[in-house]
């Protein structure tokens, strides 16, 4: 019974870590997409990074 509890806790911890890494990855990808679109429309990279981190 104790082993099962430890296993479940470990499993849940791994799942939550994987989920947060995934969502952080999605946010980073969205930010770089934002910067790329912004630069393509003629702004400089610094402006775009600031603009994209605010949204």
Swiss-Prot record:
One of its GO terms (cellular component) is extracellular region. Expressed by the venom duct. This is Conotoxin Cal14.14. Residues 1-20 form the signal peptide. Disulfide bonds join 34-48, 38-52. Probable neurotoxin. The cysteine framework is XIV (C-C-C-C). It comes from Californiconus californicus (California cone). GO terms for molecular function: toxin activity. Keywords: Disulfide bond, Neurotoxin, Secreted, Signal, Toxin.
């Amino acid at each position: 019974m104790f082993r099962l509890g430890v296993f479940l806790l470990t499993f849940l911890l791994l799942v939550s870590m994987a989920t947060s890494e995934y969502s952080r990855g999605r946010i980073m990808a969205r930010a770089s997409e934002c910067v790329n679109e912004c630069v393509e429309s003629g702004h400089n990279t610094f402006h775009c990074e600031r603009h994209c981190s605010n949204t």
